[in-house]
A protein has these predicted regions:
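Conserved beta-strand/loop scaffold segments within soluble protein domains that form the structured core
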Residues: 1-192
């Protein structure tokens, strides 16, 4: 039942040319607890490619709440391939907030399993793809518990030939009675 008043923060910086970063973040928010976690990511620009392949595992307990916020502003030589997963128990709330503004190529597709009755998930994402960038973002949710709800809400901006791709998947299992889901994606292309 602990509520953490001040957000926990982490910052990942890849500081060497031709290097890879493979961090693993594990967060367990136990029954009745509340946490906001903020993750920042960046790297200086090098003349060779770099790789970020992070892994995030999140567990949201009964009647707990977790907001996981990510701001990614990688340099244009970065390949950013993340794996982010969450499991939410009864009455739990998972909130994803994602800002993707950098990298040469990104694939960001967090997945949430709404396992417990009355659990819910919300994903809010903003993506900006400029010259030479290919950013593939979105979210996936699997409803397995009764009376679960999810909302995926994204906005993207593409400029100077940048490519922004949105994908989402919503699966409602046979035992997820009275569950509901909504997906909203809006894109703005600033090229002629």
């Amino acid at each position: 039942g602990v509520s953490v008043e001040i957000p926990l923060q982490s910052y990942f910086r890849l500081n060497a040319p031709g290097a890879g970063q493979f961090e693993h973040t594990l967060i367990i928010v136990d029954e009745g607890a509340d946490l906001h976690f903020i993750e920042g990511c960046s790297a200086p620009k090098y003349n060779v490619a770099n790789l970020h392949a992070g892994c995030v595992e999140l567990f949201v307990g009964k009647n707990a709440r977790l907001r996981y916020s990510t701001i990614e502003n990688w340099s244009k030589n970065m390949y950013n391939l993340n794996t982010k997963r969450a499991i939410v128990e009864e009455g739990g709330v998972m909130e994803w907030v994602s800002g993707s503004f950098g990298s040469h190529t990104s694939y960001l597709y967090p997945m949430t399993i709404l396992k417990g009755k009355d659990s819910r998930m919300e994903f809010t994402g903003i993506t900006f793809a400029g010259k030479g960038q290919n950013l593939d973002t979105g979210a996936k949710v699997v409803h397995t518990g009764e009376n679960t709800s999810s909302y995926i809400n994204t906005r993207s901006i593409s400029k100077d030939g940048g490519i922004s791709t949105f994908r989402s998947s919503v699966m409602i299992g046979k035992n997820a009675k009275h569950s509901k889901a909504a997906v909203s994606c809006q894109s703005l292309m600033l090229d002629d």
